[in-house]
Amino acid sequence: MTSYGNGFRMMAKCLLSLRSGYSVTAPVSKSMANVLWARYASTRIKTPPFPESITEGTLAQWLKQPGEYVNKDEEIASVETDKIDAPVTAPDAGVLKEQLVKEGDTITIDQDIAVIDTSAAPPEGGSAGPKKDEVKTADADAAKDLSTPQDSSKPIEEKPMPDLGAEQKESAPSSTKPAPDAKEPEFSSPKPKPAKSEPVKQSKPKATETARPSSFSRNEDRVKMNRMRLRIAERLKESQNRAASLTTFNECDMSAVVALRKKYKDEILKETGVKIGFMSFFSKACTQAMKQIPAINGSIEGEGKGDTLVYRDFCDLSIAVATPKGLVTPVIRNAESMSLLEIESAIATLGSKARAGKLAIEDMASGTFTISNGGIFGSLYGTPIINLPQTAVLGLHAIKERPVVINGQVVPRPMMYLALTYDHRMVDGREAVTFLRLVKEYIEDPAKMLLV
Protein backbone atom coordinates (compact mmCIF):
# COMPACT_ATOMS: atom_id res chain seq x y z
CA MET A 1 0.00 0.00 0.00
CA THR A 2 2.89 2.35 0.83
CA SER A 3 4.57 1.86 -2.53
CA TYR A 4 1.22 2.35 -4.29
CA GLY A 5 0.58 5.58 -2.35
CA ASN A 6 4.05 6.91 -3.09
CA GLY A 7 3.67 6.11 -6.77
CA PHE A 8 0.28 7.80 -6.83
CA ARG A 9 1.71 10.95 -5.24
CA MET A 10 4.68 10.87 -7.59
CA MET A 11 2.31 10.79 -10.56
CA ALA A 12 0.32 13.69 -9.10
CA LYS A 13 3.57 15.59 -8.60
CA CYS A 14 4.48 15.07 -12.24
CA LEU A 15 1.02 16.16 -13.33
CA LEU A 16 1.30 19.35 -11.31
CA SER A 17 4.73 20.07 -12.79
CA LEU A 18 3.49 19.56 -16.32
CA ARG A 19 0.37 21.66 -15.83
CA SER A 20 2.04 24.54 -14.00
CA GLY A 21 5.21 24.65 -16.09
CA TYR A 22 7.39 24.76 -12.98
CA SER A 23 9.47 22.08 -11.32
CA VAL A 24 7.72 20.83 -8.18
CA THR A 25 10.18 19.52 -5.60
CA ALA A 26 8.04 19.74 -2.47
CA PRO A 27 6.20 16.58 -1.43
CA VAL A 28 2.58 16.32 -2.49
CA SER A 29 0.10 15.35 0.19
CA LYS A 30 -2.32 12.49 -0.29
CA SER A 31 -5.33 14.82 -0.37
CA MET A 32 -3.63 17.09 -2.89
CA ALA A 33 -2.73 14.07 -5.00
CA ASN A 34 -6.38 12.97 -5.02
CA VAL A 35 -7.50 16.45 -6.05
CA LEU A 36 -4.93 16.63 -8.84
CA TRP A 37 -5.73 13.13 -10.08
CA ALA A 38 -9.47 13.82 -10.15
CA ARG A 39 -8.85 17.08 -11.97
CA TYR A 40 -6.40 15.94 -14.61
CA ALA A 41 -7.34 12.27 -15.11
CA SER A 42 -9.85 13.16 -17.77
CA THR A 43 -10.24 12.94 -21.53
CA ARG A 44 -11.63 15.60 -23.80
CA ILE A 45 -13.87 14.36 -26.59
CA LYS A 46 -13.53 16.10 -29.92
CA THR A 47 -15.83 16.26 -32.92
CA PRO A 48 -15.75 13.17 -35.13
CA PRO A 49 -13.86 13.37 -38.45
CA PHE A 50 -15.91 15.32 -40.98
CA PRO A 51 -16.19 14.29 -44.63
CA GLU A 52 -14.05 16.12 -47.16
CA SER A 53 -15.30 19.63 -48.00
CA ILE A 54 -17.36 19.81 -44.77
CA THR A 55 -16.00 22.16 -42.09
CA GLU A 56 -18.82 22.29 -39.55
CA GLY A 57 -21.83 20.42 -38.27
CA THR A 58 -24.61 20.55 -35.69
CA LEU A 59 -24.71 18.57 -32.47
CA ALA A 60 -28.05 16.89 -33.04
CA GLN A 61 -28.53 14.88 -29.84
CA TRP A 62 -26.82 13.91 -26.61
CA LEU A 63 -27.30 10.21 -25.91
CA LYS A 64 -25.53 10.38 -22.53
CA GLN A 65 -25.91 12.94 -19.76
CA PRO A 66 -23.37 14.24 -17.21
CA GLY A 67 -22.90 11.76 -14.39
CA GLU A 68 -23.55 8.70 -16.54
CA TYR A 69 -20.87 6.09 -17.00
CA VAL A 70 -19.82 5.37 -20.58
CA ASN A 71 -17.77 2.53 -21.98
CA LYS A 72 -14.96 2.88 -24.47
CA ASP A 73 -16.22 3.35 -28.05
CA GLU A 74 -19.80 3.79 -26.78
CA GLU A 75 -21.85 6.32 -28.74
CA ILE A 76 -22.60 9.36 -26.59
CA ALA A 77 -23.90 11.85 -29.16
CA SER A 78 -24.70 12.34 -32.83
CA VAL A 79 -23.50 15.12 -35.12
CA GLU A 80 -25.47 16.20 -38.16
CA THR A 81 -23.60 17.39 -41.25
CA ASP A 82 -24.71 18.47 -44.70
CA LYS A 83 -24.46 14.92 -46.00
CA ILE A 84 -24.45 12.34 -43.18
CA ASP A 85 -25.00 11.90 -39.45
CA ALA A 86 -21.74 11.09 -37.66
CA PRO A 87 -21.68 9.32 -34.27
CA VAL A 88 -19.56 10.67 -31.38
CA THR A 89 -17.94 7.83 -29.45
CA ALA A 90 -16.09 7.82 -26.14
CA PRO A 91 -12.31 7.33 -26.63
CA ASP A 92 -12.00 5.99 -23.07
CA ALA A 93 -14.26 4.57 -20.39
CA GLY A 94 -15.37 6.79 -17.53
CA VAL A 95 -18.06 9.13 -16.28
CA LEU A 96 -19.30 11.89 -18.58
CA LYS A 97 -18.16 14.88 -16.57
CA GLU A 98 -19.27 17.82 -18.69
CA GLN A 99 -20.99 18.69 -21.95
CA LEU A 100 -19.20 21.63 -23.55
CA VAL A 101 -21.83 22.27 -26.24
CA LYS A 102 -25.61 22.11 -26.30
CA GLU A 103 -27.95 20.33 -28.69
CA GLY A 104 -28.40 22.47 -31.79
CA ASP A 105 -25.03 24.23 -31.43
CA THR A 106 -22.74 24.53 -34.44
CA ILE A 107 -19.43 22.71 -34.00
CA THR A 108 -16.24 22.78 -36.06
CA ILE A 109 -13.38 20.41 -36.82
CA ASP A 110 -11.36 19.24 -33.76
CA GLN A 111 -13.57 21.17 -31.33
CA ASP A 112 -13.85 19.90 -27.75
CA ILE A 113 -17.44 18.93 -27.06
CA ALA A 114 -17.31 16.91 -23.81
CA VAL A 115 -15.10 15.79 -20.93
CA ILE A 116 -14.89 12.26 -19.51
CA ASP A 117 -13.54 11.52 -16.04
CA THR A 118 -11.41 8.45 -16.70
CA SER A 119 -10.55 7.97 -13.02
CA ALA A 120 -14.12 6.96 -12.16
CA ALA A 121 -14.79 3.28 -11.61
CA PRO A 122 -17.69 1.60 -13.41
CA PRO A 123 -20.81 1.15 -11.26
CA GLU A 124 -21.76 -2.36 -10.24
CA GLY A 125 -25.12 -2.30 -11.97
CA GLY A 126 -23.85 -0.76 -15.22
CA SER A 127 -24.12 2.85 -16.31
CA ALA A 128 -25.79 5.52 -14.23
CA GLY A 129 -28.41 6.11 -16.88
CA PRO A 130 -30.11 2.71 -16.63
CA LYS A 131 -30.12 2.99 -12.86
CA LYS A 132 -32.15 6.17 -13.04
CA ASP A 133 -34.55 4.54 -15.43
CA GLU A 134 -34.85 1.55 -13.13
CA VAL A 135 -35.67 3.85 -10.22
CA LYS A 136 -38.34 5.59 -12.29
CA THR A 137 -39.90 2.33 -13.39
CA ALA A 138 -39.76 1.01 -9.85
CA ASP A 139 -41.49 4.15 -8.56
CA ALA A 140 -44.11 3.83 -11.28
CA ASP A 141 -44.70 0.19 -10.40
CA ALA A 142 -44.97 1.07 -6.73
CA ALA A 143 -47.47 3.81 -7.53
CA LYS A 144 -49.54 1.34 -9.48
CA ASP A 145 -49.45 -1.12 -6.60
CA LEU A 146 -50.57 1.58 -4.14
CA SER A 147 -53.37 2.77 -6.39
CA THR A 148 -54.82 -0.73 -6.87
CA PRO A 149 -53.74 -2.86 -3.88
CA GLN A 150 -56.64 -5.29 -3.91
CA ASP A 151 -57.64 -5.21 -7.57
CA SER A 152 -54.83 -7.22 -9.12
CA SER A 153 -57.34 -9.32 -11.02
CA LYS A 154 -59.32 -6.38 -12.37
CA PRO A 155 -56.98 -5.35 -15.20
CA ILE A 156 -57.84 -8.59 -16.99
CA GLU A 157 -61.53 -7.82 -16.62
CA GLU A 158 -61.07 -4.15 -17.49
CA LYS A 159 -59.36 -4.81 -20.83
CA PRO A 160 -62.60 -5.23 -22.78
CA MET A 161 -64.11 -2.17 -21.09
CA PRO A 162 -62.66 0.41 -23.53
CA ASP A 163 -64.51 -1.40 -26.34
CA LEU A 164 -66.65 1.15 -28.12
CA GLY A 165 -69.41 -1.40 -28.57
CA ALA A 166 -69.68 -1.93 -24.83
CA GLU A 167 -69.73 1.80 -24.17
CA GLN A 168 -72.40 2.32 -26.77
CA LYS A 169 -74.52 -0.44 -25.17
CA GLU A 170 -74.28 1.29 -21.81
CA SER A 171 -74.95 4.72 -23.24
CA ALA A 172 -77.90 3.57 -25.34
CA PRO A 173 -80.24 2.91 -22.38
CA SER A 174 -79.15 6.13 -20.73
CA SER A 175 -79.99 8.00 -23.90
CA THR A 176 -83.46 6.49 -23.95
CA LYS A 177 -84.11 6.98 -20.22
CA PRO A 178 -84.04 10.79 -20.28
CA ALA A 179 -87.05 10.77 -22.56
CA PRO A 180 -89.46 9.39 -19.92
CA ASP A 181 -87.62 11.35 -17.25
CA ALA A 182 -88.14 14.48 -19.29
CA LYS A 183 -91.81 13.76 -19.63
CA GLU A 184 -92.34 13.33 -15.88
CA PRO A 185 -91.47 16.96 -15.05
CA GLU A 186 -93.75 18.11 -17.86
CA PHE A 187 -96.70 16.35 -16.21
CA SER A 188 -95.89 17.90 -12.84
CA SER A 189 -95.52 21.40 -14.24
CA PRO A 190 -96.59 21.51 -17.85
CA LYS A 191 -96.67 25.28 -18.36
CA PRO A 192 -93.51 26.50 -16.66
CA LYS A 193 -91.34 23.99 -18.51
CA PRO A 194 -91.78 25.41 -22.01
CA ALA A 195 -91.09 28.87 -20.65
CA LYS A 196 -87.80 27.66 -19.21
CA SER A 197 -86.87 25.80 -22.36
CA GLU A 198 -87.09 28.93 -24.54
CA PRO A 199 -84.17 30.78 -22.93
CA VAL A 200 -82.18 27.54 -23.07
CA LYS A 201 -82.71 27.45 -26.84
CA GLN A 202 -81.50 31.04 -27.09
CA SER A 203 -78.39 30.31 -25.08
CA LYS A 204 -77.42 27.26 -27.18
CA PRO A 205 -76.49 29.32 -30.28
CA LYS A 206 -74.19 31.40 -28.06
CA ALA A 207 -72.49 28.24 -26.85
CA THR A 208 -72.05 26.98 -30.39
CA GLU A 209 -70.78 30.37 -31.54
CA THR A 210 -68.08 30.35 -28.88
CA ALA A 211 -67.27 26.69 -29.62
CA ARG A 212 -66.74 27.20 -33.35
CA PRO A 213 -63.40 29.03 -33.14
CA SER A 214 -61.95 26.29 -30.91
CA SER A 215 -63.02 23.57 -33.33
CA PHE A 216 -61.12 25.18 -36.23
CA SER A 217 -57.48 25.64 -35.29
CA ARG A 218 -55.31 28.19 -37.12
CA ASN A 219 -51.98 27.34 -35.51
CA GLU A 220 -48.68 27.31 -37.40
CA ASP A 221 -45.64 25.16 -36.69
CA ARG A 222 -42.31 26.69 -37.69
CA VAL A 223 -39.55 24.11 -37.86
CA LYS A 224 -35.98 25.11 -38.61
CA MET A 225 -34.42 23.12 -41.45
CA ASN A 226 -31.80 20.61 -40.44
CA ARG A 227 -28.47 20.67 -42.22
CA MET A 228 -29.36 17.89 -44.61
CA ARG A 229 -32.61 19.57 -45.66
CA LEU A 230 -30.80 22.88 -46.18
CA ARG A 231 -28.17 21.17 -48.31
CA ILE A 232 -30.84 19.36 -50.35
CA ALA A 233 -32.64 22.66 -50.96
CA GLU A 234 -29.42 24.35 -52.08
CA ARG A 235 -28.46 21.56 -54.47
CA LEU A 236 -31.92 21.31 -56.03
CA LYS A 237 -32.03 25.03 -56.67
CA GLU A 238 -28.47 24.96 -57.98
CA SER A 239 -29.48 22.22 -60.42
CA GLN A 240 -32.38 24.27 -61.73
CA ASN A 241 -30.20 27.35 -62.10
CA ARG A 242 -27.18 25.71 -63.75
CA ALA A 243 -28.46 22.84 -65.90
CA ALA A 244 -30.46 23.28 -69.10
CA SER A 245 -32.99 20.73 -67.89
CA LEU A 246 -35.40 19.07 -70.27
CA THR A 247 -37.59 15.99 -69.72
CA THR A 248 -38.62 13.37 -72.26
CA PHE A 249 -41.24 10.70 -71.58
CA ASN A 250 -42.08 7.18 -72.66
CA GLU A 251 -44.06 4.24 -71.33
CA CYS A 252 -43.16 0.57 -71.15
CA ASP A 253 -45.10 -2.65 -70.88
CA MET A 254 -44.06 -4.36 -67.63
CA SER A 255 -45.67 -7.71 -68.49
CA ALA A 256 -42.42 -9.59 -69.17
CA VAL A 257 -40.61 -8.31 -66.07
CA VAL A 258 -43.66 -8.90 -63.85
CA ALA A 259 -43.98 -12.47 -65.13
CA LEU A 260 -40.24 -13.16 -64.75
CA ARG A 261 -40.19 -11.80 -61.23
CA LYS A 262 -43.29 -13.75 -60.24
CA LYS A 263 -41.82 -16.98 -61.60
CA TYR A 264 -38.43 -16.82 -59.87
CA LYS A 265 -38.76 -14.49 -56.84
CA ASP A 266 -39.53 -17.26 -54.30
CA GLU A 267 -36.78 -19.52 -55.61
CA ILE A 268 -34.23 -16.68 -55.61
CA LEU A 269 -35.24 -15.59 -52.12
CA LYS A 270 -34.87 -19.14 -50.81
CA GLU A 271 -31.48 -19.77 -52.41
CA THR A 272 -29.81 -16.37 -52.06
CA GLY A 273 -31.86 -14.41 -49.54
CA VAL A 274 -32.27 -11.61 -52.09
CA LYS A 275 -35.75 -10.23 -52.63
CA ILE A 276 -35.86 -9.43 -56.33
CA GLY A 277 -37.60 -6.19 -57.30
CA PHE A 278 -37.97 -3.94 -60.33
CA MET A 279 -35.09 -1.55 -59.63
CA SER A 280 -32.45 -4.09 -60.61
CA PHE A 281 -34.04 -4.57 -64.05
CA PHE A 282 -34.06 -0.83 -64.73
CA SER A 283 -30.53 -0.46 -63.39
CA LYS A 284 -29.28 -3.16 -65.73
CA ALA A 285 -31.24 -1.72 -68.65
CA CYS A 286 -29.72 1.73 -68.06
CA THR A 287 -26.15 0.48 -67.86
CA GLN A 288 -26.66 -1.42 -71.12
CA ALA A 289 -28.22 1.58 -72.88
CA MET A 290 -25.33 3.81 -71.75
CA LYS A 291 -22.96 1.78 -73.90
CA GLN A 292 -24.71 3.23 -76.94
CA ILE A 293 -25.44 6.68 -75.46
CA PRO A 294 -22.42 7.50 -73.22
CA ALA A 295 -23.40 11.17 -72.82
CA ILE A 296 -26.17 10.09 -70.43
CA ASN A 297 -23.47 8.86 -68.04
CA GLY A 298 -21.23 11.92 -68.45
CA SER A 299 -20.81 15.25 -66.72
CA ILE A 300 -19.76 18.84 -67.39
CA GLU A 301 -16.73 19.94 -65.43
CA GLY A 302 -14.02 22.57 -65.61
CA GLU A 303 -13.55 26.21 -64.72
CA GLY A 304 -16.42 28.63 -64.41
CA LYS A 305 -19.72 27.06 -65.35
CA GLY A 306 -17.90 24.13 -66.95
CA ASP A 307 -15.94 23.88 -70.19
CA THR A 308 -15.14 20.14 -70.35
CA LEU A 309 -17.34 17.17 -71.26
CA VAL A 310 -16.46 14.01 -69.31
CA TYR A 311 -17.33 10.56 -70.69
CA ARG A 312 -16.92 7.34 -68.69
CA ASP A 313 -16.69 3.63 -69.40
CA PHE A 314 -18.08 2.78 -65.95
CA CYS A 315 -21.34 3.59 -64.18
CA ASP A 316 -21.55 4.51 -60.50
CA LEU A 317 -25.30 4.30 -60.10
CA SER A 318 -27.01 6.62 -57.59
CA ILE A 319 -30.23 5.19 -56.14
CA ALA A 320 -32.61 7.70 -54.55
CA VAL A 321 -33.75 6.60 -51.07
CA ALA A 322 -36.33 8.45 -48.96
CA THR A 323 -35.37 8.81 -45.28
CA PRO A 324 -37.05 10.64 -42.38
CA LYS A 325 -34.53 13.48 -42.78
CA GLY A 326 -34.73 13.78 -46.54
CA LEU A 327 -33.74 12.20 -49.83
CA VAL A 328 -30.29 10.63 -50.10
CA THR A 329 -28.60 8.96 -53.08
CA PRO A 330 -26.21 6.15 -52.10
CA VAL A 331 -24.03 4.87 -54.94
CA ILE A 332 -23.54 1.39 -56.40
CA ARG A 333 -19.98 1.28 -57.75
CA ASN A 334 -19.37 -0.25 -61.19
CA ALA A 335 -23.00 -1.23 -61.65
CA GLU A 336 -22.28 -2.04 -65.29
CA SER A 337 -20.27 -5.11 -64.21
CA MET A 338 -22.88 -6.50 -61.80
CA SER A 339 -25.62 -9.07 -62.29
CA LEU A 340 -29.28 -8.44 -61.51
CA LEU A 341 -28.98 -10.21 -58.14
CA GLU A 342 -25.81 -8.31 -57.22
CA ILE A 343 -27.48 -5.00 -58.03
CA GLU A 344 -30.59 -5.94 -56.05
CA SER A 345 -28.50 -6.99 -53.06
CA ALA A 346 -26.53 -3.73 -53.16
CA ILE A 347 -29.76 -1.70 -53.35
CA ALA A 348 -31.17 -3.51 -50.30
CA THR A 349 -27.98 -3.00 -48.28
CA LEU A 350 -27.62 0.69 -49.09
CA GLY A 351 -31.33 1.31 -48.57
CA SER A 352 -31.21 -0.22 -45.08
CA LYS A 353 -28.15 1.84 -44.17
CA ALA A 354 -29.78 5.01 -45.48
CA ARG A 355 -32.99 4.56 -43.50
CA ALA A 356 -30.99 3.76 -40.36
CA GLY A 357 -28.84 6.87 -40.83
CA LYS A 358 -25.66 4.78 -41.10
CA LEU A 359 -24.42 5.87 -44.52
CA ALA A 360 -20.79 6.89 -44.77
CA ILE A 361 -19.69 9.75 -46.98
CA GLU A 362 -18.07 7.21 -49.31
CA ASP A 363 -21.47 5.61 -49.87
CA MET A 364 -22.82 8.78 -51.50
CA ALA A 365 -19.85 10.30 -53.29
CA SER A 366 -19.29 10.56 -57.04
CA GLY A 367 -22.36 9.01 -58.62
CA THR A 368 -22.60 9.25 -62.42
CA PHE A 369 -26.33 8.57 -63.06
CA THR A 370 -29.41 8.54 -60.83
CA ILE A 371 -32.60 6.45 -60.74
CA SER A 372 -35.52 7.67 -58.64
CA ASN A 373 -38.55 5.45 -58.10
CA GLY A 374 -41.54 7.56 -57.10
CA GLY A 375 -43.82 4.69 -58.06
CA ILE A 376 -43.41 3.04 -54.67
CA PHE A 377 -45.33 5.99 -53.22
CA GLY A 378 -47.99 5.90 -55.94
CA SER A 379 -46.62 8.57 -58.28
CA LEU A 380 -48.10 8.22 -61.77
CA TYR A 381 -46.14 10.97 -63.52
CA GLY A 382 -43.37 13.36 -62.61
CA THR A 383 -40.23 15.18 -63.73
CA PRO A 384 -37.14 14.39 -61.63
CA ILE A 385 -34.40 16.97 -61.01
CA ILE A 386 -30.83 16.32 -62.14
CA ASN A 387 -28.33 15.43 -59.42
CA LEU A 388 -25.39 17.68 -60.35
CA PRO A 389 -22.75 17.25 -61.70
CA GLN A 390 -24.53 14.36 -63.40
CA THR A 391 -26.28 15.00 -66.70
CA ALA A 392 -29.38 12.80 -66.42
CA VAL A 393 -31.82 11.16 -64.02
CA LEU A 394 -34.45 8.51 -64.72
CA GLY A 395 -37.79 8.70 -62.93
CA LEU A 396 -39.85 5.52 -62.47
CA HIS A 397 -43.54 5.56 -61.64
CA ALA A 398 -46.40 3.35 -60.52
CA ILE A 399 -47.41 0.29 -62.55
CA LYS A 400 -51.04 0.61 -63.64
CA GLU A 401 -53.17 -1.55 -65.88
CA ARG A 402 -54.12 0.44 -68.97
CA PRO A 403 -55.75 -0.48 -72.28
CA VAL A 404 -53.12 -1.00 -74.97
CA VAL A 405 -53.61 -1.77 -78.67
CA ILE A 406 -51.66 -4.93 -79.62
CA ASN A 407 -52.09 -6.46 -83.08
CA GLY A 408 -55.25 -4.42 -83.58
CA GLN A 409 -56.83 -5.58 -80.32
CA VAL A 410 -57.33 -3.55 -77.14
CA VAL A 411 -55.95 -5.52 -74.20
CA PRO A 412 -55.07 -4.60 -70.61
CA ARG A 413 -51.36 -4.37 -69.81
CA PRO A 414 -49.36 -3.36 -66.70
CA MET A 415 -47.85 -0.10 -67.91
CA MET A 416 -45.33 2.31 -66.39
CA TYR A 417 -44.52 5.87 -67.42
CA LEU A 418 -40.81 6.71 -67.65
CA ALA A 419 -39.38 10.22 -67.35
CA LEU A 420 -35.80 11.10 -68.28
CA THR A 421 -34.60 14.56 -67.29
CA TYR A 422 -31.31 15.49 -68.94
CA ASP A 423 -28.93 18.42 -69.23
CA HIS A 424 -29.36 19.74 -72.75
CA ARG A 425 -25.92 21.35 -72.60
CA MET A 426 -24.34 17.90 -73.00
CA VAL A 427 -27.13 15.58 -74.11
CA ASP A 428 -28.97 16.20 -77.37
CA GLY A 429 -32.66 15.45 -77.70
CA ARG A 430 -31.98 12.60 -80.11
CA GLU A 431 -29.64 10.94 -77.61
CA ALA A 432 -32.10 11.31 -74.73
CA VAL A 433 -35.03 9.89 -76.70
CA THR A 434 -32.88 7.02 -78.01
CA PHE A 435 -31.63 6.16 -74.52
CA LEU A 436 -35.15 6.02 -73.09
CA ARG A 437 -36.34 3.92 -76.02
CA LEU A 438 -33.51 1.44 -75.42
CA VAL A 439 -34.45 1.18 -71.74
CA LYS A 440 -38.04 0.51 -72.77
CA GLU A 441 -36.93 -2.24 -75.17
CA TYR A 442 -34.78 -3.96 -72.54
CA ILE A 443 -37.60 -3.91 -69.98
CA GLU A 444 -40.17 -5.24 -72.43
CA ASP A 445 -37.75 -8.01 -73.49
CA PRO A 446 -35.48 -8.73 -70.46
CA ALA A 447 -33.70 -11.61 -72.22
CA LYS A 448 -32.23 -9.04 -74.60
CA MET A 449 -30.14 -7.62 -71.76
CA LEU A 450 -28.33 -10.95 -71.42
CA LEU A 451 -27.36 -10.97 -75.09
CA VAL A 452 -25.78 -7.51 -75.22
UniProtKB/Swiss-Prot annotation:
Cofactor(s) needed for function: (R)-lipoate
Function: The 2-oxoglutarate dehydrogenase complex catalyzes the overall conversion of 2-oxoglutarate to succinyl-CoA and CO(2). It contains multiple copies of three enzymatic components: 2-oxoglutarate dehydrogenase (E1), dihydrolipoamide succinyltransferase (E2) and lipoamide dehydrogenase (E3).
Protein name, per record: Probable dihydrolipoyllysine-residue succinyltransferase component of 2-oxoglutarate dehydrogenase complex, mitochondrial
Active site: 424, 428
Compositional bias segments (type: Basic and acidic residues): 130-144, 154-170, 195-209
Disulfide bonds: none
Family membership noted in the UniProt record: Belongs to the 2-oxoacid dehydrogenase family.
Provenance organism: Schizosaccharomyces pombe (strain 972 / ATCC 24843) (Fission yeast)
Sites of N6-lipoyllysine modification: 83
GO CC terms, sorted: mitochondrial nucleoid; mitochondrion; oxoglutarate dehydrogenase complex
Chain intervals for the UniProt region annotation (Disordered): 119-225
Main location: mitochondrion
UniProt entry tagged with the keyword Secreted: no
Taxonomy, superkingdom: Eukaryota
BP terms from Gene Ontology: L-lysine catabolic process to acetyl-CoA via saccharopine; tricarboxylic acid cycle
